[in-house]
Amino acid sequence: MAKTPENIAIDQLDKDQIKTFSDFLMSYNKLSETCFTDCIRDFTTRDVKDSEEKCSLNCMEKYLKMNQRVSQRFQEFQVIAHENALAMAQKTGKL
């Protein structure tokens, strides 16, 4: 049975959502591993020490701020690249 354009669009949307969620999980796992490795040192007790908790929170905050800043810069460069491509297309008469 042939797929309709609507079904193809839904399949692509599902793939995009799965990719987005997969990227989120990879980022979350990287954050968890990095902060755990950097901050947790004492395995002789079940309790999390205040210093470990503070370090983990600082690590998480720094990572999230860095991720936000990289995303902002990426968006800025995308806008510039789009404007440059548009200007080039206008200059060459392809628009």
Curated annotation (Swiss-Prot):
SUPFAM superfamilies: Tim10-like (SSF144122)
Motif extent (Twin CX3C motif): 35-59
Any matching Pfam family: zf-Tim10_DDP
Gene3D superfamilies membership: Mitochondrial import inner membrane translocase subunit tim13 like domains
Annotated S-S bridges: 35-59, 39-55
Gene Ontology biological process: protein insertion into mitochondrial inner membrane
CC per GO annotation: mitochondrial intermembrane space protein transporter complex; TIM22 mitochondrial import inner membrane insertion complex
Family: Belongs to the small Tim family.
Domain notes: The twin CX3C motif contains 4 conserved Cys residues that form 2 disulfide bonds in the mitochondrial intermembrane space. However, during the transit of Tim9 from cytoplasm into mitochondrion, the Cys residues probably coordinate zinc, thereby preventing folding and allowing its transfer across mitochondrial outer membrane.
Chain's role: Mitochondrial intermembrane chaperone that participates in the import and insertion of multi-pass transmembrane proteins into the mitochondrial inner membrane. May also be required for the transfer of beta-barrel precursors from the TOM complex to the sorting and assembly machinery (SAM complex) of the outer membrane. Acts as a chaperone-like protein that protects the hydrophobic precursors from aggregation and guide them through the mitochondrial intermembrane space.
Protein name: Mitochondrial import inner membrane translocase subunit Tim9
Gene expressing this chain: Tim9a
